[in-house]
Amino acid sequence: MRVKEQLLTLRAYVPGKNIEEVKREYGLSKIVKLASNENPFGCSARVTEALTSLASQYALYPDGHAFELRTKVAKHLGVKAEQLLFGSGLDEVIQMISRALLHEGTNVVMANPTFSQYHHHAVIEGAEVREVSLKDGIHDLDAMLQQVDDQTKIVWICNPNNPTGTYVEKQKLLSFLESVPKSALVIMDEAYYEYAGAEDYPQTLPLLEKYENLMVLRTFSKAYGLAAFRIGYAVGNTELIGQLEVARLPFNTSTVAQSVALAALEDQAFLQECVKKNEEGLHQYYAFCKEYNVFYYPSQTNFIFLKLGIPGNEAFERLMKKGYIVRSGAAFGIDDGIRITVGLKEENDEIIELLKELVNEQVQKEETYS
């Protein structure tokens, strides 16, 4: 028995190494994971409180329509409840959209590098993938527009982008939306939306009324600190969302996930404190990069992508041996970079000292051979 031919060309998603795996592999007792862009400050205390009240519901199926969460999220965003589609993390939302819209003979347009699951699910559905290289680390919307044709079903824009942390400016997005054919669905993946503080970062939800071919994705995994519970959602026009509901698995978001998302949503003070501390953490890395002349992309997320002057895999391995897990840029096709999640202040301080050692060693090598 053989699976789809498309599956034979793909590899299963490989996440960042987990803590227990690294402990076993390197014989370490203390590990700091800065690889998967998780919230180092955890989640709201209200989440813990919500969990204690759920024991009596474990034997029951969840609300398949997520009515209470749907209502609260809609109110929070200022949209209609019918505009929301919930999934088990944005991974499932991306899968649902791809399954519903793509097939052989269609194509998708996206940046490179960007979040890998856009490409992954397009290939599974038999669609052509048209990738456009980033320009100075940012989506090149002009070049992406040139790749769009009558068979383009989806244009993916990860904003802010993973793995670079960069963003598309408001005016450039508006120009793109005015130019792109209405037959192509433009999806703004805003998984890191809560961290984006740039003045010209586009606020996309108000644009949904004007652009029916626009959709916005958001998640509770990042700034809200609920990655373990797997819950994200799409916001779009009611007709399309209603059609996509057909592709959604029954009971796809658990009672636990819905309950903790509600609790997290109600604690905006905790969220804002996390965002504030994250910004302070980013500036720790900026100061290091400027002092040591290390290339980096200014970030609108909770991670930073930088280049130390050595292969990303080498930096990854050497940091891991010291107990720090990051992501090698090689995983994204950028062999000379690494992506580091912003951690607690002391974690940032500690890994920055290790980064300084790597940079100094490289400088000494270059001086030796010069």
UniProtKB/Swiss-Prot annotation:
CDD domains (UniProt xref): AAT_like (cd00609)
Enzyme class: transferase
InterPro entries: Aminotrans_II_pyridoxalP_BS, Aminotransferase_I/II_large, HisP_aminotrans, HistidinolP_aminotransfase, PyrdxlP-dep_Trfase, PyrdxlP-dep_Trfase_major, PyrdxlP-dep_Trfase_small
Similarity remark: Belongs to the class-II pyridoxal-phosphate-dependent aminotransferase family. Histidinol-phosphate aminotransferase subfamily.
GO terms, molecular function: histidinol-phosphate transaminase activity; pyridoxal phosphate binding
Lineage: Bacteria, Bacillati, Bacillota, Bacilli, Bacillales
Protein name according to UniProt: Histidinol-phosphate aminotransferase 1
Catalytic activity: L-histidinol phosphate + 2-oxoglutarate = 3-(imidazol-4-yl)-2-oxopropyl phosphate + L-glutamate
EC number per UniProt: 2.6.1.9
Domain of life: Bacteria
